[in-house]
């Protein structure tokens, strides 16, 4: 009988029959990557760590029985078309939950040092990540991967679900379910399905049945037709092909930056914390005196980063008249035929907010203008616009697809915004001995230049939010010195 610390394979708690699950059109349009979450816990003694690992394995086994598609592998569908994808599940399928003791590695900070420094992830990626997550997603890739790491005084769980299977909301729900199953294992509670039943096949057909559209209709300005093999949503046959395409796309991006006079640099990642009191003050400052122009706290938060970064850069004098902020909307409840929140799949729509740069850069108008632009973009979403995006992808020749335009990505006055505040990673308990994570992080790459990226992390139990910014060193330095920004934000940590 193999040791639990050498046998990483986890099989479903109940038998899962061999099957092929055809995915939806929105799944096929999703980026082909596996975002990795990091969960940190303090752990005393290796015996507690091993007990926690056993609970995670048993909890994962129950999760796989609860959501069988997680045990499958990504393939092209029956049509052999890279835009029609499927998950193949074999009768002996399993998922790896790796384990590694890196507590003796002097290059890895101790848990106490991580706490003291705000939980930076410098130098972590290649060491703590599951092996499967370090390469590109290709045909045959698993639907999830996970690894538990023992460090000095603590543990780090690194896991991810394929974006082809799970958008942001579904990713959060899967993490919550795994935590719940692990907690039940630690409490000696027998297996019970925790995922609400959903008619998945019916929902996928619904999401893939798109109305006729005008093939010549103009595209959203932040999209462009691009060679399929260079796009983020293309499924390559193997790692070699994927790496070759990635290298080509990166070389093209670098050449464009250099031609524009930019000096490519390693992106910097900075975390800022906003307390409930500061969030309330920020929303008040971003709210217009016009009662009809209500905004959310998230509109205000996006508006703060968007307006201050624009003011720092002063790009309007260089010929740009407006700025765009791209974000993703979960549209499960906004579709004419709503999709249950428990559905695991992609039901998101890319949206762009637009704001004149002369307003955005204004000390008196910038915050309110940016927040209101975010609100109007949210309110202005329509189902036909989302359907046109998917229809265009499916109607193009096989060697073409839609992707975010390089022009958008490489213009410094634009911004990406991602709201994960509703995720429950910081509040879910994984049972004894781990319990509730002390902190969560997400491993992402950043551009060597161009648009800044803002990620709002899962909310803390006290209502605080951490926000992660990826941008150039010059922007980060200017934000440290920006009185308006620092009125609301508290620095946590920074790394490259």
From Swiss-Prot:
Annotated active site: 163
Domain of life: Eukaryota
One of the Pfam families matching this protein, by short name: Transferase
Keywords: Acyltransferase, Transferase
Alphabetized Gene3D superfamilies for the sequence: Chloramphenicol acetyltransferase-like domain
The keyword DNA repair is annotated on this UniProt entry: no
GO molecular function, one term: acyltransferase activity, transferring groups other than amino-acyl groups
Keyword Transport: no
EC number: 2.3.1.-
The protein's annotated pathway: Secondary metabolite biosynthesis
Task of the protein: Acyltransferase; part of the gene cluster that mediates the biosynthesis of squalestatin S1 (SQS1, also known as zaragozic acid A), a heavily oxidized fungal polyketide that offers potent cholesterol lowering activity by targeting squalene synthase (SS). SQS1 is composed of a 2,8-dioxobicyclic[3.2.1]octane-3,4,5-tricarboxyclic acid core that is connected to two lipophilic polyketide arms.
Quaternary context: Monomer.
Family: Belongs to the plant acyltransferase family.
Protein name according to UniProt: Acyltransferase M4
């Amino acid at each position: 009988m193999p040791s639990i610390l050498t046998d990483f394979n986890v099989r479903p708690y109940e038998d899962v029959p061999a099957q092929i699950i055809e995915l939806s059109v929105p799944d096929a349009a999703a980026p082909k990557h596996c975002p990795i979450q990091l969960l940190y816990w303090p752990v005393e003694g290796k015996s507690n760590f091993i007990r926690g690992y056993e609970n995670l394995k048993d909890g994962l086994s129950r999760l796989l029985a609860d959501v069988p598609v997680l045990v499958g592998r990504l393939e092209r569908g029956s049509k052999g078309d890279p835009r029609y994808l499927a998950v193949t599940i074999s009768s002996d399928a399993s998922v790896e939950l790796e384990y590694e003791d890196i507590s003796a590695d002097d290059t890895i900070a101790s848990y106490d040092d991580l706490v003291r420094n705000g939980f930076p992830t410098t130098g972590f990626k290649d060491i703590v990540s599951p092996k499967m997550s370090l390469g590109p997603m290709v045909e045959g890739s698993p639907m999830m991967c996970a690894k538990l790491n023992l460090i000095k005084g603590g543990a780090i769980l690194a896991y991810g679900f394929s974006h082809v299977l799970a958008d942001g909301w579904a990713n959060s729900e899967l993490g919550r379910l795994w935590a719940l199953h692990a907690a039940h294992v630690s409490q000696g509670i027998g297996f019970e399905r925790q995922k609400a039943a959903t008619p998945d096949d019916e929902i996928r057909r619904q999401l893939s049945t798109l109305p006729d559209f005008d093939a010549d209709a103009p595209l959203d300005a932040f999209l462009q037709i691009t060679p399929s093999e260079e796009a983020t949503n293309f499924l390559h046959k193997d790692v070699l092909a994927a790496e070759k395409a990635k290298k080509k796309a990166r070389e093209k991006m670098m050449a464009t930056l250099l031609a524009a006079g930019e000096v490519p640099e390693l992106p910097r990642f900075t975390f800022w914390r906003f307390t409930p009191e500061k969030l309330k003050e920020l929303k008040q400052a971003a709210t217009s005196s016009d009662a009809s122009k209500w905004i959310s706290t998230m509109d205000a938060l996006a508006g703060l980063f968007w307006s201050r970064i624009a003011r720092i850069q002063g790009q309007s004098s260089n010929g740009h008249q407006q700025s765009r902020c791209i974000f993703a909307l979960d549209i499960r409840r906004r579709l004419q035929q709503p999709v249950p929140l428990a559905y695991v799949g992609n039901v998101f729509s890319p949206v762009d907010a637009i704001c004149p740069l002369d307003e955005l850069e204004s000390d008196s108008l910038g915050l309110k203008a940016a927040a209101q632009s975010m609100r109007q973009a949210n309110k202005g979403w329509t189902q036909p616009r989302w359907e046109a995006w998917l229809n265009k992808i499916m109607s193009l020749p096989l060697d073409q697809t839609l992707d975010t335009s390089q022009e958008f990505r490489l213009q410094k006055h634009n911004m990406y915004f991602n709201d994960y505040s509703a995720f429950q990673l910081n509040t879910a308990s994984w049972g004894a001995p781990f319990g509730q994570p002390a902190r969560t992080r997400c491993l992402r790459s950043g551009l060597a230049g161009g648009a800044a990226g803002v990620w709002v992390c899962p909310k803390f139990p006290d209502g605080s939010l951490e926000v992660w910014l990826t941008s150039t060193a010059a922007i980060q330095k200017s934000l440290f010195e920006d009185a308006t920004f620092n009125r609301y934000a508290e620095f946590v940590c920074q790394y490259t």
